[in-house]
UniProtKB/Swiss-Prot annotation:
CDD domains: DEXDc_SecA, SF2_C_secA. Residues 342-362, 1060-1134 are annotated as: Disordered. This is Protein translocase subunit SecA. Residues 1104-1115 have a biased composition (Basic and acidic residues). GO terms for biological process: intracellular protein transmembrane transport; protein import; protein targeting; protein transport by the Sec complex.
Amino acid sequence: MFEWIKNLFGDPNERELNKLWPIVEEINDHYEELQDLTDDELRAKTDAFRAEIREAVADIEARQNEIREKLKRAPGLEGPVGGDGQVTEMEGEALSLDERDALYDEFDELEEEWQDVVEDTLWELLPEAFAVVKETCRRMLGETWMAGGSKIEWDMVPYDVQILGAIVLHQGRIAEMKTGEGKTLAAVMPLYLNALTGRGCQLVTVNDYLAERDTEWMGPIYEFHGLTVDCVNRYDPHTEGRKEAYEADITYGTNNEIGFDYLRDNSFVVRPEQLMQRGHHYAIIDEIDSVLIDEARTPLIISGPVPDQENDEYRELRDPVEQLVEAQRRLVRSFVKETRELLEEKEEAEEEGDSRRAQELEDEAGLSLFRASRGYPKNRQLQKLLNEPGMERLRQKTENFYLQENAKRMPFVDQELYFSVDEKKQTVEMTEKGQEYIAKIMDESEDLFVLPVVGDKIAEVEDEYQEKVDELEEALQEEDLSQEKRENKYMNDKRELEKELQETKREIYNTYSERAERVHAIEQLLKAFTLYERDTEYIVQEGKVQIVDEHTGRVMEGRRYSEGLHEALEAKEEVEIQNATQTYASVTLQNYFRMYDKLSGMTGTAETEAEEFNEIYDLDVVVVPTHEPVRRDDKDDLVFQTKREKYNAIVEKVKEYNKRGQPVLVGSASVEVSETISRTLEREGIPHNVLNAKQDRAKEEAQIVAEAGQKGSVTIATNMAGRGTDIQITDEVRELGGLAILGSERHESRRIDLQLRGRAGRQGDPGESQFYVSLEDDLMRLFGSDRVAKVMDSMGIEEGEVITHPWINKSIKRAQSKVEQNNFAIRKRQLEYDDVLNSQREVIYKRRREALTGERFHGQVLNMLYEYIEALVERHYGQGNIAGLREDLLRTLAFDLEMDREEFVQLGEDGVVDHVYDVATDYYRQKRANIAQPFHQTLRDLKQERGDDMIEQVFVDFTDGQDAIRAVADVDEALETNGEEINEALERTAMLQTIDEKWTDHLRELDELKEGIGLRSFGRKDPVVEYKMEAFDLFSDMMAEIGQEVVSLVFRAGPVVDDEVQTEGQGPRRRLSQRNAQTQHDSAQPDYSIDADGDGGGGQEGEAAERDPTVEEKQPVTVADEPGRNEYVTVRNNANGETTEMKWKYAKKKINQGGWSLVS
């Protein structure tokens, strides 16, 4: 349709290719010159390239090193301490926080400059570097090695089109290269070139087998030049092997594992040496459409169990909901029957010439038909009726009528139903009739299933509160009291009214929450029974509900539907309902891969999604021409009325192919369809292979798919099975017509259909493809019904007859286009929500990484201290409450403020803030000195004792009487800084521990917020805008809480006192026991409890693995028993150091409130 535009302005893709072909020619010129070099001379080219890159960025890196050294040598605001506890000067120049920030900004600008210079340099090196790779491939011809479990003989030298694709990949674009065109080899050239920067690059694949196979297959090419290559999927998380894989010049891995490692690094790692990844420099994503489009709506989530979470609601409601669904089925059958009867009466009225009565009867029949489709759209009797001439048009006409004027007539349609189903939007909503029915079944009040209008209730109690306040003011005016007493009484009485108001509000919210949970559970169960089918959306294996990926047909291991849907499916299938989980960390693949400095990808089908790639990822798609012309015969679709007719036709066609020995691959959209066709072929005695989610085995799958091109082979596979594996055919099969592809239905996305078609006709081989479609297929039923119904009616199609018509093919394409646009809109909307979380994630992960590595961490504690003091003073100053301020400072920061009311008023609010801050920092400096000096002395003694056998790290246990944490200090750093390293370690650990705890809670709050935010649209508010505002408020509160808790912990915490220094030979320390813990803030010489074991009892990787719920759980450590309720214990007041004895039941309350610790 747009050919005349292309003729006028030129094809933009051709224009891009025309720019690149001269570069390909230049590469080939270099290639000819390189053939005379020896192997060592060829290898030397790599060293020369690296040297050129180093030279180009030498000045930039020198300045960056200067900045690093300057920041490192600058003394801290707290200052290291000498042996006498006094602050000493370091060798470097002192820097203010503003000066530090300026240096950090300069460093960031230099980093951007580094990227630009390197890109320019790589572009200059590209022709010769790519030629080096091509020459290396030529020299490898005939060599053999193992790859993917099989011995392979190297027989590839890049074609010009592969070099063209490689240039596109280096430019940070998407190369669309058809199946069999050698994408794997094309990626080698840009990976080699970008690895020369020394910052590593990654190739991301879709499954473990391909990641490991491609590492082994392409590895010798890189290794010829001394580059290291590894695969992350070979190793378990948090292991040295996986860390080394990321340290390699070129790293292969799956999108899931690489994404999860990012989350692990930012969630469970507590020491810099435990970090796996080293940055996001350059990545090529293989099958990029699968990763960034198909999986875009499914975030990577690391989750753990929710404590004390019960799932009884789903069990209790399952049977009542199943009865409700059965009642709806009966109702829908009655609507179908009524429709037929009304249409028969209509025919009689028409025969009698009563056109008005006939129209009324048709309208009534349309309403019954529409109600049936709203009540249970997948009902078989309904589907059979809709396939009859004129029925789909009648349903569509009725739907259009009731959807007019913002669907104001829809309540009339749904009032006769127990619940309404919107299959397109995948929603189910219970009606008033349904609420009455389920309340009757459960013998409960109907009100328990109706959500109160919270806004109205809140407004009502707030009005009542305001009336009481007004009455209070009037009553006080009449009392004979002084102005001061009147104001005090007013404030006290008003405070009581406020408490009463808050309690009433809390009751309203609790009532809403309880009912909302129940209604939500019912709606999720209704979805499970009506919209989700076993062996289509999910399978049940080994007593578990497992999700089937609609795009690949594979089981999505470890994934669960959110918002209670998975629990509802487990209840429906009567398997064990797994405990609900809470999110510890999550990221969408969209946002993860947008972090890379440069990103590119390759696939056989990207052009149809070019708009989305450009809009969301800023990635252009370049279609690379094939090495040989495509000879595959893509036949028109065959359309049948019913699925049964379609499946029978597919089996007959398979028999026809099989009889003459031509291999055939049948693509299916679900497990159920693949097994239906398989059973029929078994009855016909035709041997075949089946690949679906129930046989999820990537390596065997790839082998079966690879053999699908052999003579007489019949393979049934769900969508995308074996993607990334070529189906090669023999000369004998070529003579038979090549591989035949039969699609059992059209997918929602044209791209998935093109991928299936692309399995045949690789590298100019013959082949053919054809899709079999029925009007009962979901795509046709939901999105192509109106136009198809008109065509059917006009053609008078009989049952069993194949439908072929240009309009049908256009309708299919139009239906697919509708779904693609809808899915794109959903992904964009999802991204709007996730962008909110992503911006918060970036802040929190940056703060966590800075605490972990010490980079830019200096001064954060004092910044948080100042903000916390500001908040405290603001809270108390307006009320003149100096006593409250002193109490809060003593409780949270463990020091007493000496200030009288006169000074409090005279200084003003800002003055009080500055004064309190000065007092706090003086106290904190002294506390740090009191901790550092004895720690330094202990280490010196230990070093003298051990000599050359001195360990690298020590572990010190701290407690504030309530929380216990373990700080890890570097011995050399501690000795160099006179023990100050232990204070830095305490701050780092406090920050990490608090961030992890608060971030997990914050994610749960965001999940809860997101669940109900869509309802805001009924109040004519944009849910995304509302989500952004409330999420920001929650995030601000969280950041304030993190600051307060970190400051409080580092101010109050002291080292655990012990009589012995534990060394390596004594084995790991027991877990901290608060029964034996003791804090000491002001002792000049506390006896340190140091664990000098080289790995702290758990190993560097083991410590992170223990925190990570995705790693197999280790045996827990036993903790000492808690004292009996009436057992007497000794506790210490942390503010003044005094000890006292009391019963544990009283002591426990004091310790939990803070400021007290258990001594014995």
